[in-house]
């Protein structure tokens, strides 16, 4: 998503061919005035949303759909192309997810990725079997046919493999496009039917030629135009908000992060004074943030903010609770209760605005259902406070104009709306705040200890000039005490973990290689300036297998 579309976005500036299809023009409304889209059918891969993000980077709108989406609905949406995601199953398993065979007769260009390629092969008469040698990680891709899908992709380029099955026999009419040392059929195609399959994952950052391949598919094979832009999204989002809300009043929970701040700017532009922002201080914010935030919005942005001090209410509700899922749900539910009570004082209000993003929806469990077990194919990771914690008796209607955007797209929208860089580049901060960074049972004393340690960490990271180098940098108070020595006295105090990660969208993350001198400065200040902490450790876990937050 960029500020303006450009034909120069095409690979080598080539014109896109017109691909004839048997799908009629769709009438579905699409965000951002996107006349064209690429649909991703999700078979349970954790990378499905990453595929969507990569397609959007080509300035083409994409949407993730269930693999069970009826053919009639796909016809109605009229995508210019379809991508079949990977998945955890084997296509020859009795209850493996299957797509409607009519999909292959739509005349729409289709790209199968990993499981998606194997499904294409199996349903069209080829054969898939357990590979003699599974292939995981980086592999050199040797290109047999450098045209079409592999135009401008370097022979021998690195691609990311993650499969234990392989294609034994291609369906009739298919040709071999590429192979690796361990995978004879790494890419295949039926050119006249516009059907393509790749065994690797072009969407992951480790696949060096992945974006070139996806651009070839989107521009040259599907014939898409680069029209998914920031300006177009803002225009359409404002139109949709006005159409949905009308002259009704909207209440927005403001946190000061880029999501809620961007949403506030967007809604204020759409409905003006019919928006009321409410900042609920639940007692788990970072040091000095509540005061700074309210002043900033009132005095600089001229957007009224109602401040609510609800710290005592939250602490009481969370007393004795140590399970992280319960914490999130309790905090989410209490947020809504506070909103309901305060809205009666400030209202009436008809709508509650939420800064829900695409990853929030995905991580709170996907929409695919396993036909055998009835369970969701995408395994639930953790519920987010603005998704999983909402009570059933919610009195507000929801408005969520950002729910199909990734974090980087939200930053672009915020910047285009005039949001200051200090907020645009603000690191993600969880809705439950420091409550989920104090492991185990919460107490006010523990939160205060963590708040001081977090303040020191942020001070030193900012002073180092490395704040924007990290997706997130924060501290976690551990539920264990350790023995230490300060002066001539023995201490017995809490251990604190430091967490620094790099990421593009929060879906995956790597632990950051933080300079030792910065770590030393942070650790020394914390143990010397924060009573209650005598040990600092560093978390070097990536996501997966871990999550970014500890709870």
UniProtKB/Swiss-Prot annotation:
UniProt keywords, alphabetically: ATP-binding, Glutamine amidotransferase, GMP biosynthesis, Ligase, Nucleotide-binding, Purine biosynthesis
Database matches in PROSITE patterns: GATASE_TYPE_1, GMPS_ATP_PPASE
Enzyme class: ligase
GO MF terms held by the record: ATP binding; GMP synthase activity
The UniProt record lists the keyword Nucleotide-binding: yes
Catalytic activity: XMP + L-glutamine + ATP + H2O = GMP + L-glutamate + AMP + diphosphate + 2 H(+)
Segments forming domain Glutamine amidotransferase type-1: 37-227
Residue stretches making up the GMPS ATP-PPase domain: 228-426
Listed Polar residues bias regions: 19-28
Subunit (UniProt): Homodimer.
Task of the protein: Catalyzes the synthesis of GMP from XMP.
Protein name: GMP synthase [glutamine-hydrolyzing]
